[in-house]
C-alpha cells in the first residue's frame, strides 16, 4: 500500500483545523468549544505525524505523543472547569462567563 502524499494529508489537517476553529468561534456552549479545541490539536498532531512519515523521521511521532499528553491534560482541566461552571450557573453558555468572580 502506498504512502499518502504530503499535500493530501496537509489538506485534511487544514480542514480539520478550520472546522475546530469554526467551532471555537461560533459555538457558545463550553463543552462544544472544548471539543473543537481537541479537534484543532488533533489536526496539528496529524500534520506532525504525516511530515515525520514523509521524511522518514521519528520526530513526528514524538511530537504526536507530546500533543496527545497536552490534549489529555487540557481535557482534564477543561472538563473540571465545565463541571464547576455548570454547577454554578446550571447551563454551559460561555457568554455568562463574564459574571464569574473569584
Swiss-Prot record:
The keyword Ribonucleoprotein does not apply. One of its GO terms (biological process) is ATP synthesis coupled electron transport. GO terms for molecular function: NADH:ubiquinone reductase (non-electrogenic) activity; quinone binding. Gene3D superfamilies: 1.10.287.3510. It catalyses: a quinone + NADH + 5 H(+)(in) = a quinol + NAD(+) + 4 H(+)(out). It is found in: Cell inner membrane. Signal peptide: none annotated. The keyword Plastid does not apply. Pfam families: Oxidored_q2. It is an enzyme of class 7 (translocase). Its EC number is 7.1.1.-. One of its GO terms (cellular component) is NADH dehydrogenase complex. Its main location: membrane. The chain crosses the membrane at residues 6-26, 30-50, 62-82. It is a multi-pass membrane protein. It comes from the Bacteria. Keywords: Cell inner membrane, Cell membrane, Membrane, NAD, Quinone, Translocase, Transmembrane, Transmembrane helix, Transport, Ubiquinone. NDH-1 shuttles electrons from NADH, via FMN and iron-sulfur (Fe-S) centers, to quinones in the respiratory chain. The immediate electron acceptor for the enzyme in this species is believed to be ubiquinone. Couples the redox reaction to proton translocation (for every two electrons transferred, four hydrogen ions are translocated across the cytoplasmic membrane), and thus conserves the redox energy in a proton gradient. NCBIfam families: PRK05715.1-1, PRK05715.1-2. Belongs to the complex I subunit 4L family. NDH-1 is composed of 14 different subunits. Subunits NuoA, H, J, K, L, M, N constitute the membrane sector of the complex. This is NADH-quinone oxidoreductase subunit K. It comes from Acinetobacter baumannii (strain ATCC 17978 / DSM 105126 / CIP 53.77 / LMG 1025 / NCDC KC755 / 5377). The gene is nuoK.
Amino acid at each position: 500500500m502506498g504512502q499518502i502524499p504530503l499535500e493530501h494529508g496537509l489538506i485534511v489537517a487544514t480542514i480539520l483545523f478550520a472546522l475546530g476553529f469554526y467551532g471555537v468561534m461560533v459555538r457558545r456552549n463550553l463543552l462544544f468549544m472544548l471539543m473543537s479545541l481537541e479537534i484543532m490539536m488533533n489536526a496539528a498532531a496529524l500534520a506532525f505525524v504525516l511530515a515525520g512519515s514523509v521524511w522518514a523521521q521519528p520526530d513526528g511521532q514524538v511530537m504526536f505523543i507530546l500533543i496527545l499528553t497536552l490534549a489529555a491534560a487540557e481535557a482534564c482541566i477543561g472538563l473540571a472547569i465545565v463541571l464547576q461552571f455548570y454547577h454554578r450557573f446550571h447551563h454551559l453558555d460561555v457568554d455568562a462567563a463574564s459574571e464569574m468572580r473569584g
